[in-house]
Amino acid sequence: MAFKLWLLDEETIYEHVFERYTQLEGQSGKLAQDLGIQDRRGGVLEITFEPSGLEGGRKKKRVRRRNKASSVEEDQNVAVDSYHVSVGQSISSLHSSRDNGNSTTGYVLWSTTPFFINWLLYSTSAAPFRLGSQVEVTCGSSCEGHMLELPRLIDLTGADRGKRGILELGAGISGILPVILGNFVDTYVSTDQKGILNKLKDNIMENLSQLTRKRCISRSLRLELPTVEPVGDADITAASLPSKSTLHLEVAALDWEKINLQDKKTHSLHPELSLIGETCSSVYVIAMDVIYNEYLIDPFLKTLKQLKHWLQTTYNLQFHVLVGIHLRSQEVTTLFLEKAIIEYDLTVYDIVDQVIQESRFNFYLIT
């Protein structure tokens, strides 16, 4: 069964937060009681993503290979590819008071991101994000709701003619979202503060082999399509050869406290954002575990408002946001929802799904 959406408002914010943290308390014996670092023991993490619990007891051959994604039987409803990534992280930088202006949480991989990837690719309940479909919306405590049409976040088949993009905010150093989800979109822009970008680029390049469904071009990573040499007397061009579709993948600095898209002079400073507008018909902004203290909330929401207004008015894009939160402080979660809904007038939905509710995470759809 697909997930449902609960439309939150000024009254239901508090009901939602109370219920969600009550669920957490009831599961305290099953869930890890930590801050959410994926693994603080090592500098290099090896992580595998693969299908599990497929419906109907169907057995599918799985192949696990180092730095090589395996593709098996095609299925439109769930992803069937497996991925293995190596993530270089810096525990020392996490605890440094000098690195990146003392903003250091991005130097390690946080567990919200791997959970989101597994849920999005392999959970049957996440199908609306893979297929593009209507989702049931419940409004407040009423049993009567409506249906919301969602565009595909990712296209597993490659047959959809729509051009889709992902803009990642607060990417951190891991680079696993672009090298995995990049297989299923046309444009991917991964952003964070300037001090994070070199390690982010290193991890993307280390795991570029996981982009098995796409040819990747990137100005920021200096990746171009390979040239094709003539064979015999034939003048063969790249366009004449059977090939994969192309992914535009960029890494860019984006400071939430400094961005000002209302000033046309600053547009030239963010060509990667213009790339999304020029190449896509829909965009999802993805932000995983970026809301963990109260000081980040206003800059983050101001950035979302600017991006929404600019991409919709300038390029007429379908615009949606997915925010993943590791549920730590109840006060921070409440404040984020209050500000998003009341102060910034954003439409916020709680993604209601059993798999998510059995975890320490929560995901919100913002339109």
Swiss-Prot record:
Q: Which GO terms describe its biological process?
A: methylation
Give the molecular function GO annotations.
Answer: S-adenosylmethionine-dependent methyltransferase activity
Q: What is its EC number?
A: 2.1.1.-
Q: Record-annotated residues binding S-adenosyl-L-methionine?
A: 110, 170-172, 192, 256, 288
Q: Which UniProt keywords apply?
A: Methyltransferase, S-adenosyl-L-methionine, Transferase
From the UniProt entry, list the residue stretches annotated as the region Disordered. Answer: 55-74
Q: Which GO CC annotations does the UniProt entry carry?
A: cytosol; protein-containing complex
Compositionally biased residues, Basic residues = 58-68
Q: Which family does it belong to?
A: Belongs to the class I-like SAM-binding methyltransferase superfamily. RKM5 family.
In UniProt terms, what function does this protein have? S-adenosyl-L-methionine-dependent protein-lysine N-methyltransferase that monomethylates 60S ribosomal protein L1 (RPL1A and RPL1B) at 'Lys-46'.
Please state what the protein is called: Ribosomal lysine N-methyltransferase 5
Instruction: Name the encoding gene, please.
Output: RKM5
